[in-house]
Swiss-Prot record:
UniProt key word Transmembrane helix: yes
Record's note on what induces expression: Expressed in the late phase of the viral replicative cycle.
Name the UniProt record assigns to this protein: Uncharacterized protein B475L
Coiled coil: 195-235
Subcellular location: Host membrane
Annotated family: Belongs to the asfivirus B475L family.
Glycosylation sites: N73, N195, N455
Membrane-crossing residue ranges in chain numbering: 7-28
Source species, domain of life: Viruses
Gene Ontology annotations for the cellular component aspect, listed alphabetically: host cell membrane; membrane
Gene3D superfamilies attached to this UniProt entry: arf6 gtpase in complex with a specific effector, jip4
Residue numbers spanned by region Disordered: 297-332
Membrane topology: Single-pass membrane protein
Length: 480
C-alpha cells in the first residue's frame, strides 16, 4: 500500500471513529433518559439524528463544526494551521482524483461533502439498528464492546472506500465516455445527413436539367429549320407538279384534292367514284383508238353519189362538226354521231343548222332513231355497197381531174360574187365561236391534233400510217 492510500485510509478511519462514537455512546445515553423501552428509544434516537442532519441545516452545520474540531484534535493539527475550508478540501480530495479536485470550486466541494455525510450517516444508522447489531449495542455492552465496535469500523471503512470508488469512476466516465445522444438528437442527426444528401442530388439534377434544356433548345432550332426546308421543298414539288400537269394536259388532281373536305378520303362513295389508275385509263384509250380505226375502215369508202375533189389541208380544232362525248362509256354513241356528222357535211348541212332543226323538231330525231333501230339492215347494206364498189369513188376522182374547169368556174363565181365569200367567212367564224368546251382531259388529249386533212367536199381522209401510240401533232386521214 503506498503512502497516498495509507493517508486516505487514516482519514476514513478518523471519519468513522467520530460517527461510531455518536451512534454507540451519545445516542445510547440519550435513550437511557426516556421511560420507554430502551431498544425502541434507541431506534428512535438513531432515526431522529439521521433526519436532523439531512433536513435541519443548523443541526448539520453544528455537526460539521464538531467534526472539524474532532478531526483537528485526532490528527494533532492546529486549527489555525488547518482552516475549515482546508478541512473540507482535505475530506473531499480523499474521495476524488487529484486532476479533478484542483479544478472544483469550494462551493462545489461543500455540496459534495454534504452528500457524502448524509449518505454515510444513513447507511451507518441502518446497519446499527439491524437485528444482528442492535441487541449487542443495547444489552451486554461491556462484554461485546470490542467486537461490536470492530464490526462498526470495518463497515464504515468499507462503505467509504466503496463511495470513493464510485466517485472516481463517475469522474473518469465524464472524461473518457461521451454520453449517449437522446432519440431526438439521433433523429435530428440522421435527418440532417439525409437532407445534405438530398441537397447534393438536387444540385446534380439541376445541372443535368440545364444541360438537357440546352440540348432541347438546339434540337428545337434544328427541327424548325428542317420543317421550313421541308415546307419549301413541298411547295416547290407542288409547283412542279402543277407545271407538269398543265403541260401534259392531265387531270388537275392537286387542285381537285385541295378542294375536297378532310373527311372525303375516308368516304366509301369517294372510293367508288375515284378515278382509275393511269395505266387502266391508257389501256381504255388505246382500245378506243382501235375501235375508232375499225369504224373508220368501215366508212373509208365515200358514196358514189358525191364526187371527191383534190384534198386540201386546213388547221382546225374540235368544233360543231365533231361532237365530243361526255363519258368514256359512250363510245358507240360517239362513233355513230361522228358518222352522222360526216353524212351531214356531205349533204351540205352544218352542225349548227342540224342542232337548230333538232331543237325545233324533236319528233324527227326520235323518228330517225326509231327507224334505225327497227331497220339496222339498211345501214349494213350501205356499208356493204361501199366496200363492194370501190370503183365509184375512183370514177369520181378521175372525173374531178379530167374536168378542172368546174373548179375554175367555182372560183370565178366567188370573184364575181364577193358577198357569197363573206358569208362563208362569217359562217366559219361562227363555227369557231361554237366550238365545244372539252371537260374530260383525256378526250382533250384525244382531240389534240392541230391539223386535219379534209377534201373540198368536207370529207376527212384516212391515212394508212395511223398508229395507236399517237400523242399529238398533225394527223392526215385520206380516203382511198
Amino acid at each position: 500500500m503506498d503512502q497516498e492510500e495509507s493517508h486516505v485510509i487514516s482519514i476514513f478511519e478518523t471519519f468513522g471513529a467520530y460517527f461510531i462514537n455518536i451512534f454507540y455512546n451519545f445516542l445510547y445515553k440519550n435513550a437511557l433518559y426516556k421511560k420507554h423501552s430502551i431498544v425502541m428509544e434507541y431506534q428512535y434516537q438513531v432515526k431522529g439524528y439521521i433526519l436532523g442532519v439531512k433536513q435541519n441545516k443548523k443541526l448539520y452545520e453544528k455537526m460539521l463544526d464538531s467534526f472539524y474540531k474532532y478531526f483537528c484534535n485526532i490528527t494533532q493539527i492546529n486549527s489555525k494551521t488547518l482552516s475549515f475550508s482546508n478541512f473540507v478540501s482535505t475530506i473531499v480530495d480523499s474521495f476524488l482524483p487529484k486532476e479533478y479536485s484542483q479544478s472544483i470550486s469550494l462551493e462545489k466541494k461543500d455540496s459534495i461533502l454534504e452528500l457524502l455525510l448524509c449518505d454515510y450517516i444513513s447507511n451507518l444508522g441502518t446497519f446499527i439498528t439491524t437485528e444482528k447489531m442492535l441487541p449487542f449495542i443495547v444489552k451486554n455492552r461491556k462484554e461485546n464492546y470490542h467486537r461490536i465496535t470492530k464490526e462498526m469500523q470495518d463497515y464504515s471503512l468499507t462503505f467509504l472506500l466503496k463511495k470513493r470508488m464510485e466517485l472516481y469512476n463517475k469522474f473518469l466516465r465524464k472524461q473518457a465516455y461521451v454520453e449517449p445522444k437522446t432519440e431526438l438528437e439521433e433523429t435530428y442527426t440522421r435527418l440532417s445527413s439525409y437532407n445534405r444528401s438530398l441537397l447534393y442530388q438536387i444540385e446534380e439534377l439541376t445541372s443535368e436539367k440545364k444541360s438537357l434544356l440546352a440540348e432541347l433548345s438546339t434540337l428545337r432550332k434544328k427541327y424548325e429549320k428542317r420543317q421550313s426546308e421541308y415546307r419549301r421543298l413541298v411547295q416547290l414539288l407542288y409547283q412542279q407538279i402543277q407545271r407538269s400537269s398543265s403541260s401534259k394536259n392531265s387531270y388537275p388532281l392537286t387542285k381537285f384534292i385541295e378542294t375536297l373536305p378532310s373527311e372525303h378520303f375516308s368516304n366509301e362513295d369517294y372510293q367508288k367514284e375515284a378515278p382509275r389508275d393511269q395505266k387502266q385509263v391508257e389501256t381504255e384509250l388505246l382500245k378506243q383508238q382501235e375501235e375508232l380505226l375499225a369504224s373508220q375502215e368501215l366508212t373509208s369508202k365515200s358514196p358514189s353519189n358525191y364526187p371527191v375533189p383534190q384534198s386540201r389541208t386546213i388547221v382546225s380544232k374540235p368544233s360543231d362538226n365533231y361532237p365530243v362525248p361526255q363519258s368514256r362509256s359512250s363510245k358507240i354513241d360517239f362513233d355513230n354521231s361522228l358518222q352522222n356528222q360526216e353524212l351531214n357535211v356531205k349533204n351540205g348541212f352544218s352542225g349548227k343548222t342540224i342542232l337548230e332543226l333538232n331543237q325545233d323538231n324533236p319528233e324527227i330525231e326520235e323518228d330517225i332513231l326509231e327507224f334505225n333501230q327497227d331497220n339496222p339492215e339498211i345501214e349494213e347494206d350501205i356499208l356493204e355497197f361501199n366496200q363492194d364498189n370501190p370503183e365509184i369513188e375512183e370514177d369520181i376522182l378521175k372525173f374531178n381531174q379530167d374536168n378542172p374547169e368546174i373548179e375554175e368556174d367555182i372560183l370565178k363565181l366567188n370573184q364575181d360574187n364577193p358577198e357569197i365569200e363573206e358569208e362563208v367567212i362569217l359562217e366559219k367564224e361562227n363555227h369557231k365561236e361554237d366550238e365545244p368546251i372539252v371537260q374530260n382531259p383525256f378526250l382533250e388529249n384525244f382531240w389534240k391534233p392541230e391539223q386535219k386533212t379534209f377534201n373540198q367536199s368536207g370529207l376527212f381522209e384516212e391515212s394508212s400510217d395511223f398508229s395507236n401510240d399517237w400523242s399529238g401533232g398533225d394527223v392526215t386521214l385520206n380516203f382511198s
